[in-house]
Every structure is written in structure tokens, then in C-alpha cells.
Amino acid sequence: MKRFAVLVLMVVVALFCTGMGDLGGQPEGTIPETDVRIEAKVVDRTGVETSLNQFSMDGKTYLDALRGSGQLTIPFQQLATLSLGKATGDEMAVQVKLKSGVVMDLAIRKRAVFYGSTGYGAFVIKARDVARIDFP
């Protein structure tokens, strides 16, 4: 009986030890690597402007948005400005201005995350904290 109790204790300890690691994802202080180099200027809701390169949305180099009930993806190279509005539920209103001059109202997930490099460190910001993104 004593051996059984020791065995059970060892199994429980082993389970706790294997569960102590992190859940993966990006290491702290890094940004997702992308094939395309995108430059952007992010303005947060407090008015702070941050110029970035290697810009991405959830590690992708395109805007992943909803247009009505449909899904729309627009490469960042075609965008001039994103103006983010208020969140309703899990979505945020976003006004998109393309470099061609076309303006449209879309929605994005408010939990979306934007990444970029400042040249002196990694920059990460949640969509709900962004007021505007300009693409030079």
C-alpha cells in the first residue's frame, strides 16, 4: 500500500511539473516575422504616435475585416489610413481609406493585435487601444 501511495504521489508531482511551462506563442520582446516589410504609424487612444516597420496584424500583412456578413482581406500596401471607432461586442468599427481614395466602413475583431518594430524594440498594441494607423 505504501508503494502505491508513493507511485500516486509521483504521478501527481509529474503532472504538476509538466504543466509549469508557458503556453507557447511569441517570446517576450519579439514580433512575428513577415515576408513583406510594411511601415506604419500607429496613434493610440492617448494620442501617442509610434512609427513602426515590420508591421503586422496578428502576424499577417493584410487587414482581416468584416464587410457586412462577409470576410474581407486587404493587403496593407493598398491602405492609406485606418481609423478605429468604438467597440460593440467582439467587434470594432473601422473606417478604411485606400491609397486609391476609396473609403469604406468595416469591422475588425477588438482582440486583434498589431505588431511592429520601432528600431529600438518590439511594439505590441491591441486593436481596442488604437485610434488610427497611417501607412506612408
What residue spans do the PLM features occupy?
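Compositionally biased alpha-helical segments
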Residues: G21-P136
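Extended, compositionally biased eukaryotic interaction scaffolds
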Residues: F4, F16-G19
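Bacterial N-terminal signal peptides that target proteins for export
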Residues: M1-L9
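Bacterial N-terminal signal peptides
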Residues: V8-F16
